[in-house]
Amino acid sequence: MTPIRCLLACLLLLAAAPPVAARTLEVGPGKPYAQPSQAAAAAGDGDRVMIAPGEYFDCAVWPQNNLTIEGASEEGTVITDKACQGKALFVISGPNVTVRNLTLTRARVPDGNGAGIRAEGKTLVVDHVRFINNQDGILSTDEPQGSITVRDSQFTRNGACEKACAHGIYAGHIGLLRVERTAFSETRRAHDIKSRALRTEVVGCTFVDGPDGTASYAIELPNGGSLLAKNNTFEKGPKAENHTAVIMIGSEGITQPTREIVVEDNTARADGDYNTVLVYNQTATEAVVQGNRLSGPITPLHGDGSAS
């Protein structure tokens, strides 16, 4: 057989070979991998990483595609105190990753942006994850075609403004940020959600400062971008860092299209001794602010649009 025919035959055999089966990698005491970082080094595309209950003083970098990282329970599986690459407890650079049933806590780095998750891939789903006492809960890089979906999760006592401000969720220039049925509480000085996404959707969430929370805005879209905020509950507390608004749009200049702004069927309460606004719109897009229930010294809209 000539070398060319041999090469072609080998290529045909490779093409006909079945795909490598996805594996489940088990992490924990007595498991094949003692720490999440060990599983991260061994995992391949399509694998599932199962982390047993316990407290792991560890961090991990996940470059794999189509990966699922899952704890045994939302409260019982805790990743804490370490930061990989000077960034986060979990640095996720692979596309199509799901993180589920974990607590990510106490992320700190010298630049002030230590995150529970640093999202650097194309598609990330976060499901039933608690982010507690981090500088950033989730911090993403720019990925114009990317999306982040957060659902049924909890962000508590995140945020910092020691250097640059860090937030509960800070989305860079991505295609879509969607947050569903998620609770934000006691955010420190910064915003619960800061999003530079082309489209941001916040549905069925709660934002509570309480008596001691010092959050600035519940939702900020500093560069514009479309917004749907529906069926949420907002409580702006007496120690809020910024009294101007609950939702702020365009505070750093409009640099991307804002196709629509819809804020509807929310409940908003201002508990402080100050006046505030539900939606502060600095774009030329007319905001639709409707069906919201307001209490305390709060008005529905400043800027272009209509309130009903």
Give, region by region, the residue ranges found by the protein language model.
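Bacterial N-terminal signal peptides that target proteins for export
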Residues: M1-L8
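Right-handed parallel beta-helix
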Residues: P53, E70-V78, P95-R106, T123-N133, ...
